[in-house]
Amino acid sequence: MTKAHILILTDLDGTLLDATTYSYEAATGALSAIQTLGATLILVSSKTRSEMEPLRLRLDNRHPFIVENGGALFIPMGYFPFPLEQAAPRGDYEVVEIGTPYVRLRTALKEIGRDLGCRLRGFGDLSLEEVSDLTGLSPAETLLATQREYDEPVVVESNGMAWNRLSAAAATRGLRWTRGGRFYHLMGGNDKGVASRRLIAWYERRAQQEGRALITVGIGDSPNDLPM
């Protein structure tokens, strides 16, 4: 009987990485076990592509990855032996964009704050020093974290602002909120689950071609990981 292939989709901060130090040292045993099993580890995060690429290099992870709460999938060129629906070439990747362009999110955030009379500060409103203070990232890491394309982390600075009012204001603009470990995130119709299911379908197709079963595992620690 052909051995089943194991596909593991993991969040980063607070899951694979320490929530405070961003180190994966505590996960080295698990990473070794994954390698021994021949399983595939997919990184799924609210982080930007610019943040995730250096981490992939350090982990020697050459598999597809999902950025900015499912805003886009980045698949190494030629990774799957068949054409990928809705994928466009970009450098070394085939990219499937699911999320809303960042410039539209920025415009909507300003409108929502004005309409609700509350102070909503996204990464685009904060200095690099402020983002660094809020996240604990180094200056170099902070610069990478602010290179957003599909998702805006937001600090809600109005006491007592009802979640349903924020949700409704986003929904009227075709957008939605989710909650991560540190921030609210304003985004489009994407989430980690939408992107993960798209990717899993391709792995299932490849597994069928190889005559293998596919076992999927999702790991996370925050509400934005639940769809995964």
Segments predicted by a language model, with ranges:
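Short, small/polar residue-rich loop motifs at catalytic or cofactor-binding pockets
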Residues: 2-5, 60
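Asp-based phosphoryl-transfer active-site loop
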Residues: 4-21, 221-224
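Hydrophobic "anchor" residues on beta-strands that sit immediately upstream
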Residues: 7, 64, 217
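Active-site phosphate-binding/coordination module
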Residues: 25-122
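Alpha-helical scaffolding segments of alpha/beta enzyme cores, especially the outer helices
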Residues: 29-32, 54, 165, 198, ...
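Short, hydrophobic beta-strand segments that form beta-sheet elements in well-ordered domains
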Residues: 43, 217-220
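Glycine-rich beta-strand-to-loop/alpha-helix junction loops that act as flexible
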Residues: 69-70, 219-221
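Conserved acidic, metal-coordinating active-site core of Asp-based
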Residues: 112-217, 224
